[in-house]
């Protein structure tokens, strides 16, 4: 056995003994009448205490005689004979508690409190005071154990160093990393800000099916399930788009949905199979109207969250009060690729050779539009740091977008990029039923065998289009990526409480 194996074996043995010791303590507690208290009436949090009383001096706190009731997890303890200091951690921070046997009785202190462990959940009632070093603390009058931690917490100095364990055991990550709470609090605030903005702009929030007969609205591999009662294969939705446009056909004019989508595809720092998206549609408008709305939405979110429009993400400064840059896909490729010309992008043989020269595997059924999009994704996308709308996407890669009036080979479509990430996608919606029918069929015909399994001809949507879809613009925003940028996190797993992981294997 190597030294590392010996050390690991020794660590496991120590952990096993510690767990058994704690389990026996719980057995003893139950014999003494512990029955898992049903509640504890707390009246404050650690953060509120600091916010309100940190500026008070020792004498002021004595004269005020402020009694507080607080609950949380004991994460540190320093026993000094007949008195102890311990740290209580709640969701908003930590606060120091002072306890001595004179205040709570000698027997309780010696035979109960001193036998409790780090990680135990406690309820504390006491008065505020400041120590000689000026630390705001609570002088404990009464302390109750609310639940026993049967396993020791991660090392307080190193926390959880294994990334996968952090994601798999998020509860431990939250206990050992106080900063994590602020990320997910901001996530909630961002979603609130989006909803507030949409409602203030006269949008109605709607809900469309998660279980669908045909997974439409995007080209992605779906999750497949089965409905026993109706004896039918069904799919978790990959996008709500086609249902939302049916509502526009039905007479709704300004709608949005903020919910989950599911795509049975890769997991990475940028992708999670289960993700949150906001889609919005405005009748009697075009993609330029939607770009303007998108800019205003981002201004509103950052102002709500930070009281300012300036943020930092991945060491880059952003100012969302400034107009977003607008660039066509063709112009963006020319800007970042000095060896190709505008005429080359229109010549099938030249654009194909250029794509091959930069490592793109060109498929036989691809036209210029698909190849141009692949070049853009490989050479441009990650270089778009400041907020940029890329417009004029080829028809070939935009089956649901309206053709441009001047150039029928491109669409009135945009994608928003920030920090090298695609954050949003929007366009003037295609409402020509014959064109839509043809594009659906062409998409299936040109796809490879693997993609073909994921493409469906949606007869119900074509039927709905026959009743007339008014001029409409649509928008989709990836909420998880947006939250990454606004909270300065470089992995999507750090903004999802329980990201998708492979099954644990011992």
From Swiss-Prot:
Broad EC category: ligase
Record CDD domains: LysRS_core, LysRS_N
Binding site for Mg(2+) 2: 422
Superkingdom per UniProt: Bacteria
Coiled coil: none
Cofactor: Mg(2+)
Binding site for Mg(2+) 1: 415, 422
Compartments, as annotated in UniProt: Cytoplasm
InterPro entries assigned to the protein according to its UniProt record, in alphabetical order: Aa-tRNA-synt_II, aa-tRNA-synth_II, aa-tRNA-synth_II/BPL/LPL, Lys-tRNA-ligase_II, Lys-tRNA-ligase_II_N, Lys-tRNA-synth_II_C, NA-bd_OB-fold, NA-bd_OB_tRNA
One Gene Ontology term of the molecular function aspect: lysine-tRNA ligase activity
Cellular component terms per the entry's GO annotation: cytosol
Broad class of the protein's primary localization: cytoplasm
Record note on cofactor: Binds 3 Mg(2+) ions per subunit.
Known EC number: 6.1.1.6
Classification via SUPFAM superfamilies: Class II aaRS and biotin synthetases (SSF55681), Nucleic acid-binding proteins (SSF50249)
Keyword terms of this UniProt record: Aminoacyl-tRNA synthetase, ATP-binding, Cytoplasm, Ligase, Magnesium, Metal-binding, Nucleotide-binding, Protein biosynthesis
GO biological process, one term: lysyl-tRNA aminoacylation
Reactions catalysed, as given in the entry: tRNA(Lys) + L-lysine + ATP = L-lysyl-tRNA(Lys) + AMP + diphosphate
A Pfam family assignment: tRNA_anti-codon
NCBIfam families documented for this protein: lysS_bact (TIGR00499), PRK00484.1 (NF001756)
Annotated family: Belongs to the class-II aminoacyl-tRNA synthetase family.
HAMAP family from the UniProt entry: Lys_tRNA_synth_class2
Self-association state and partner proteins as the record states: Homodimer.
PANTHER family for this protein: LYSINE--TRNA LIGASE, CHLOROPLASTIC_MITOCHONDRIAL (PTHR42918:SF15), LYSYL-TRNA SYNTHETASE (PTHR42918)
Protein name per its UniProtKB record: Lysine--tRNA ligase
Lineage summary: Bacteria, Pseudomonadati, Pseudomonadota, Gammaproteobacteria, Enterobacterales
Name of the encoding gene: lysS
């Amino acid at each position: 056995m190597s030294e590392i194996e010996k050390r690991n074996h020794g660590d496991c043995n120590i952990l096993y003994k510690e767990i058994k010791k704690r389990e026996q303590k719980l057995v003893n507690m139950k014999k003494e009448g512990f029955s898992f208290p049903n509640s504890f009436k707390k009246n404050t949090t650690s953060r509120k205490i600091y916010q309100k009383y940190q500026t008070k001096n020792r004498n002021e706190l004595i004269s005020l005689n402020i009694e507080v009731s607080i609950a949380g997890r004991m994460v540190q303890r320093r026993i000094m004979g007949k008195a102890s200091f311990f740290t209580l951690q709640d969701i908003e921070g930590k606060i120091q508690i002072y306890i001595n046997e004179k205040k709570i009785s000698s027997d309780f202190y010696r035979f109960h409190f001193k036998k409790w462990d780090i990680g135990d959940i406690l309820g504390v009632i006491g008065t505020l005071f400041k120590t000689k070093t000026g630390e705001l603390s609570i002088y404990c009058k009464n302390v109750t154990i609310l639940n026993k931690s049967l396993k020791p917490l991660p090392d307080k100095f190193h926390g959880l160093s294994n990334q996968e364990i952090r994601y798999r055991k998020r509860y431990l990550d939250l206990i050992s990393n106080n900063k994590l709470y602020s990320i997910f609090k901001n996530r909630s605030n961002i979603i609130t800000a989006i909803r507030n903005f949409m409602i203030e702009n006269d949008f109605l929030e709607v809900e469309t099916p998660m279980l669908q007969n045909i997974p439409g609205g995007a080209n992605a591999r779906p999750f497949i399930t089965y409905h026993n009662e109706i004896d039918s294969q069904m799919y978790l939705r990959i996008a709500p788009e086609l249902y939302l446009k049916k509502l526009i056909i039905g007479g709704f004019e300004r709608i949005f949905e903020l919910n989950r989508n599911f795509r049975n595809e890769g997991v990475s720092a940028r992708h999670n199979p289960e993700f949150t998206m906001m889609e919005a549609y405005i009748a009697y408008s075009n993609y330029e109207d939607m770009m303007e709305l998108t800019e205003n939405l981002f201004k509103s979110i950052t102002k709500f969250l930070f009281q300012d429009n300036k943020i930092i993400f991945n060491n880059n400064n952003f100012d969302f009060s400034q107009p977003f840059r607008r660039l066509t896909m063709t112009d963006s490729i020319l800007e970042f690729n000095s060896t190709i010309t505008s005429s080359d992008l229109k010549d099938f043989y030249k654009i194909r050779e250029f794509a091959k020269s930069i490592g793109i595997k060109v498929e036989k059924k691809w036209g210029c539009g698909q190849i141009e999009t692949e070049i853009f994704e490989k050479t441009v996308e990650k270089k778009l740091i400041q907020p940029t709308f890329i417009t004029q996407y080829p028809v070939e890669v935009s089956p649901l977008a309206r053709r441009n009036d001047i150039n029928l080979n491109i669409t009135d479509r945009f994608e928003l990029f920030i920090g090298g990430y695609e954050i949003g996608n929007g366009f003037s919606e295609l409402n020509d039923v014959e064109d839509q029918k043809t594009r659906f069929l062409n998409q299936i015909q040109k796809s490879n065998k693997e993609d073909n399994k994921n493409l469906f001809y949606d007869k119900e949507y074509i039927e709905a289009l026959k009743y007339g879809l008014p001029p409409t613009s649509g928008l989709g925003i990836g909420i998880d990526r947006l939250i990454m940028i606004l909270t300065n996190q470089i992995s999507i797993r750090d903004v999802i409480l329980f990201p998708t992981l492979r099954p644990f294997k011992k």
